[in-house]
């Protein structure tokens, strides 16, 4: 009987922290759809090459525009 209670106690203690911690809804990782709607100006995009004035061909799929190809 004691071993069953011990197993139940361990299971409850392991599961409690996973369900008791409130999730922070303000994190960008929690809102991918909202993050994708934000329009980054081309000049400030991290894949924008200031010397060439355009993004590389590989950056087109990542959302950098204009693509010069």
From Swiss-Prot:
It is found in: Secreted. Keywords: Amidation, Disulfide bond, Hydroxylation, Ion channel impairing toxin, Neurotoxin, Secreted, Signal, Toxin, Voltage-gated sodium channel impairing toxin. This is Mu-onotoxin-like Am3.2. The lineage of its organism: Eukaryota, Metazoa, Spiralia, Lophotrochozoa, Mollusca. One of its GO terms (molecular function) is sodium channel regulator activity. Mostly non-hydroxylated. Contains 3 disulfide bonds. It comes from the Eukaryota. The modification 4-hydroxyproline is found at residue 66.
